[in-house]
């Protein structure tokens, strides 16, 4: 149905074409469905493809079992198979990539040869080209990823600027937002691990939790007043796994140099030092309606302990 639809068909069977020039070049391909101007235009021998929308699957020649729904969806696919694209320009640039699923405007739009990616949400995995085994759920999640592999992003703008980082997991809007090349990171919570572009093997759990280096684990932001559990933390102390044992560490002499003090924590200064991202109203992300939710507790909570710089100096003096 439509001018030039199925014009070149020779032995292809069970094809349906609706729209000007739909399935225009098909010769022997079978079981294809094309709906929209120039949909599946270049298909020759490809089978079991479904294209709905103007120029959807336009360049497909021999690719099989692809489904495209939306203007320009899977537009440049040639031999890629088992791809599903739903939304304007979704998987638009895919050529030979296989087993990709894109749902949302411009999702996986730049993918060319990447395989086994899943993108759900407008502009999710937008610039992925060759990355494989990535999963993005949420608007602009993994938006800038190009060649990064095995990343999982759940939440709007999660892993937004990741380009080449691998094996990252981000759950929560804006989690791991600024990561570009860091790998093996985990962020769970709204704004968790927001800053830091190249850290690796770090974990941030909780709203607005900040990571400042690789190989860190952080629980909660600086508004947290208690972290506890049924048992205490443990650390490796087994002599079987320690080498070069020597009694060279200062003991009592080091303790005598320490100066116990009482203090209040200036959380506003800490936020500035850690570059905690600001909200739209300019307040810290640990604030609500312009007032820090926990400030009354800060003011009342007198702490005791040591000054880190003084402990460091004592250690240096004793070698």
Question: At which residue positions do the language-model features occur?
Answer:
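Small/polar residue-rich beta-strand/coil "junction" motifs that cap repeat-based extracellular fibers
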Residues: 175, 179-251, 256-258, 285, ...
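Intrinsically disordered, low-complexity regions of eukaryotic proteins
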Residues: 132, 151-152, 166, 240
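Trimeric beta-solenoid/beta-helix "fiber body" segments of extracellular/virion adhesins
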Residues: 3, 20, 37, 54, ...
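Intramolecular chaperone/auto-protease modules of tailspike-like proteins
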Residues: 236-319
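Conserved SAM-binding site of S-adenosyl-L-methionine-dependent methyltransferases, i.e.
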Residues: 5-6, 12, 22-23, 29, ...
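Extended alpha-helical scaffolds used as interaction platforms
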Residues: 1, 5, 16-18, 33-35, ...
């Amino acid at each position: 149905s439509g001018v030039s639809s199925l014009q070149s068909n020779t032995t292809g069977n069970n094809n349906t074409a609706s729209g000007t020039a739909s399935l225009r070049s098909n010769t022997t391909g079978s079981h294809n469905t094309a709906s929209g101007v120039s949909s599946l235009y270049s298909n020759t021998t490809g089978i079991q493809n479904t294209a709905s929308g103007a120029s959807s699957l336009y360049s497909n020649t021999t690719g099989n079992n692809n489904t495209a729904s939306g203007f320009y969806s899977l537009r440049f696919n040639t031999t890629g198979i088992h791809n599903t694209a739903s939304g304007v320009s979704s998987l638009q640039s895919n050529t030979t990539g296989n087993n990709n699923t894109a749902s949302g405007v411009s999702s996986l739009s730049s993918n060319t040869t990447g395989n086994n990616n899943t993108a759900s949400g407008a502009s999710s995995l937008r610039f992925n080209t060759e990355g494989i085994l990535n999963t993005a759920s949420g608007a602009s999640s993994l938006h800038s990823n190009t060649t990064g592999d095995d990343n999982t992003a759940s939440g709007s703008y999660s892993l937004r600027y990741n380009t080449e980082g691998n094996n990252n997991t981000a759950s929560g809007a804006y989690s791991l937002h600024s990561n570009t090349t860091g790998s093996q990171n985990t962020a769970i919570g709204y704004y968790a691990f927001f800053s830091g572009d190249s850290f690796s093997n770090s974990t941030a759990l909780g709203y607005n939790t900040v990571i400042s280096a690789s190989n860190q684990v952080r629980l909660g932001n600086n508004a947290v007043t208690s972290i506890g559990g049924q048992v205490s933390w443990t650390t490796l102390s087994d002599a079987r796994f320690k080498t070069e044992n020597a009694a060279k560490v200062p003991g009592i002499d080091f303790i005598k140099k320490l100066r116990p003090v009482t203090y209040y924590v200036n959380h506003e200064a800490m936020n500035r030092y850690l570059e905690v991202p600001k909200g739209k109203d300019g307040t810290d992300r640990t604030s609500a309606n312009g007032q820090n939710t926990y400030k009354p507790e800060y003011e009342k909570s007198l702490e005791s302990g040591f000054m880190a710089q003084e402990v460091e100096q004592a250690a240096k003096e004793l070698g």
